[in-house]
């Protein structure tokens, strides 16, 4: 259920700050959000898959930590990212 190479490359090019940027918080949060959305679809069909649910919770927590970091570092980048991804925060 992981993202394909093409999907990852598309997300990286959409959210990168400069060419070759794969480690900025924006890129990491966008990749985690795509993985989370994909896993949510998996759980609609496989409700008893508790091992994958643990991984989902871990991804959600990692995304939350990265968003908190970005919010403390640069509020305008945080607000832009939240708007682009459609997150509730």
Swiss-Prot record:
The keyword rRNA-binding applies. The keyword rRNA-binding applies. Coiled coil: none annotated. Keywords: Ribonucleoprotein, Ribosomal protein, RNA-binding, rRNA-binding. InterPro entries: Ribosomal_uS15, Ribosomal_uS15_bac-type, uS15_NS1_RNA-bd_sf. Pfam families: Ribosomal_S15. GO terms for molecular function: rRNA binding; structural constituent of ribosome. GO terms for cellular component: cytosolic small ribosomal subunit. GO terms for biological process: translation. Belongs to the universal ribosomal protein uS15 family. Part of the 30S ribosomal subunit. Forms a bridge to the 50S subunit in the 70S ribosome, contacting the 23S rRNA. NCBIfam families: S15_bact. One of the primary rRNA binding proteins, it binds directly to 16S rRNA where it helps nucleate assembly of the platform of the 30S subunit by binding and bridging several RNA helices of the 16S rRNA. Forms an intersubunit bridge (bridge B4) with the 23S rRNA of the 50S subunit in the ribosome. This is Small ribosomal subunit protein uS15. The lineage of its organism: Bacteria, Pseudomonadati, Pseudomonadota, Gammaproteobacteria, Pseudomonadales. The gene is rpsO.
């Amino acid at each position: 259920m992981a993202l394909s190479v093409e999907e990852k490359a598309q997300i990286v090019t959409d959210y990168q700050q400069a060419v070759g940027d794969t480690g900025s918080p924006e890129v990491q949060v966008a990749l985690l959000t795509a993985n989370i959305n994909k896993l949510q679809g998996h759980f609609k069909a496989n409700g008893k898959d508790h091992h994958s649910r643990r991984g989902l919770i871990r991804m959600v927590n990692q995304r939350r930590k990265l968003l908190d970091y970005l919010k403390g570092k640069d509020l305008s980048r945080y607000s832009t990212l939240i708007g682009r991804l459609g997150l509730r925060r």
